[in-house]
């Protein structure tokens, strides 16, 4: 996959290096050309000097072929504008933006842009939002038989209760991250757009659970 990153600070450079190591092609945009030194001499991706929400700059970075876009510059407004341009003008499927003001998170979330306050951001968290495939194990019991994992959830689960998700997938939802905050859901909690679902499940059932989460809820007769 080709991935475009706006911002070559600590998170942006770490993200670019991690993605390249995973076999993705990467382009990094920054208005300060000296910031590219953080990438190191071994980085083989594109270095594009410019403003990350400028359409010509984005095209130079290969946004038209990109499967993901990360806005991790030092400015909230620049990040959200760039994220919206990537999604709305270029149709990039996986988009995430870093913000510094957590009070803005809900507004951005309504725009369909995953955001989390910067104190919680790490390159690893951004990686999971850009490449939402498969379960990310966060904890395993000593025997290795049970694990806690963040599982990518199909958007078709939005609007359905946690109880239905648990019943159809056979997992227990441990907690949900919503607008950057962890919540302990009840069986009546309804999944919202942008929720990150963390579940307890048997390690030998990971692939089955991933498939059920990706498939979405079963069709209901007469529903």
Curated annotation (Swiss-Prot):
Cross-referenced InterPro entries: K_uptake_TrkA (IPR006036), NAD(P)-bd_dom_sf (IPR036291), RCK_C (IPR006037), RCK_C_sf (IPR036721), RCK_N (IPR003148), Trk_Ktr_HKT_K-transport (IPR050721)
Residue ranges of domain RCK C-terminal in the record: 133-215
GO molecular function, one term: potassium ion transmembrane transporter activity
Keyword Signal: no
One cellular-component annotation, GO: plasma membrane
Binding residues annotated for NAD(+), in chain numbering: 7-11, 30, 73-74, 98
UniProt-listed Pfam families: TrkA_C, TrkA_N
Domain RCK N-terminal: 1-118
Origin superkingdom: Bacteria
Record bears the keyword Ion transport: yes
Keywords: Ion transport, NAD, Potassium, Potassium transport, Transport
Reported function: Part of a potassium transport system.
Domain topic, free-text comment: The RCK N-terminal domain binds NAD and possibly other effectors. This is expected to cause a conformation change that regulates potassium transport.
Protein name in the entry: Trk system potassium uptake protein TrkA
Upper taxonomic lineage: Bacteria, Bacillati, Actinomycetota, Actinomycetes, Kitasatosporales
Gene giving rise to this polypeptide: trkA
